[in-house]
Each structure stands twice: as structure tokens, then as C-alpha cells.
Amino acid sequence: MMKGGMAGLMKQAQQMQEKMQKMQEELANAEVTGQSGAGLVSVVMTGRHDVKRVSLDDSLMQEDKEILEDLIAAAVNDAVRKIEQNNQEKMSGFTSGMQLPPGFKMPF
């Protein structure tokens, strides 16, 4: 490979790394809302899986503790699934031009 070609590849790799870093920051800062019980429980979570807020409908204050715990767990799980889906959608656009093997996961 010629010297200029190698320099071009290195520059391209550096640009790709910068874009990847920016994409990872965007994904980490994204917020999603997971819900359960037809919206009676909602959880706001960041792309880093940090729970920022849990909201409970007032009507749930009369419910059995176990029901409430199940609804909170379901809302958290819903938020996690939404983060994973969001990450896959964003990264598929980023990696669409790359020749990656099937099932290859990007680093996160």
C-alpha cells in the first residue's frame, strides 16, 4: 500500500472513531420512558441505564405492595428494552456502510 493510501485510511479511521464517540454520547444522554399498568407507572431512564424518575399514579397508593413492585419492575424493564432498541436503530444507520460480519455488536 502506498504511503498516501495509508495516511488516508488512518484519517478515515480517526474520523470514524470521532463519529462513534459522538454517537455513544448521544445514546448515553438520550432519555426514554418505560411504562406499565397502562401508564399507571412510568420510569424515565437514560441511555446509561440510570433511572432519573419514577412516577406512580395516585390510584396505586391503595394497591397491594407486591402489585406495585411488579409494576415498577415492568416499567424499568420496558425502559431498558426501549434503550436497547434506540441504540440498535441509531447504530444501524451508523454502520450501514461498513462490511461487518452478521451478529457483530458495536462496543456497548
Swiss-Prot record:
Gene Ontology cellular-component annotations: bacterial nucleoid; cytosol
Region span, Disordered: 1-25, 87-108
UniProt keyword terms in alphabetical order: Cytoplasm, DNA-binding
Domain of life of the organism encoding this protein: Bacteria
Cystine bridges: none
Ranges of Polar residues composition bias in the record: 87-98
Location of the protein in the cell: Cytoplasm, Nucleoid
Name of one Pfam family that matches: YbaB_DNA_bd
InterPro entries: YbaB-like_sf, YbaB/EbfC
GO molecular function, one term: DNA binding
Subunit field text: Homodimer.
Function: Binds to DNA and alters its conformation. May be involved in regulation of gene expression, nucleoid organization and DNA protection.
Entry similarity comment: Belongs to the YbaB/EbfC family.
Protein known as: Nucleoid-associated protein PA1533
